[in-house]
Amino acid sequence: MDMYKKIGVVGDKDSVLAFKALGIDVFPVVEDEEARKTIDKLAMTGYAVIFVTEHVAKNIEETIERYTRQVLPAVILIPSNQGTLNIGKQRISDNVEKAVGVNIL
């Protein structure tokens, strides 16, 4: 079993290119369907963590939600270079509330 799991980031080109310097695999997308297919492909090829920019995620909610119910991959929403939509923050808050029974954030 591979000790090191792969990490990828999906989003618009300007937002994801900086992650390449950190050694993270980057997958620039333009169209919603391209984003769906990319996330599905990453999930099927052993990526443990997939970061998705909020601006991309807002248009592919059903794909994001499908992976929320699974242990791996962890799909984590991040702000794009255009700023945040607070979707990722809200998801974390919801998950914490679900886990502990009260919103502590």
Swiss-Prot record:
Q: Which GO terms describe its molecular function?
A: ATP binding; proton-transporting ATP synthase activity, rotational mechanism; proton-transporting ATPase activity, rotational mechanism
UniProt keyword annotations, A-Z: ATP synthesis, Hydrogen ion transport, Ion transport, Transport
Task: Report the Pfam families cross-referenced here.
Answer: ATP-synt_F
Q: Which SUPFAM superfamilies match?
A: AtpF-like (SSF159468)
Q: What's an example GO BP annotation here?
A: proton motive force-driven plasma membrane ATP synthesis
Q: To which protein family does this belong?
A: Belongs to the V-ATPase F subunit family.
The role this protein plays is: Produces ATP from ADP in the presence of a proton gradient across the membrane.
The protein's name is V-type ATP synthase subunit F
Species, as recorded: Clostridium perfringens (strain 13 / Type A)
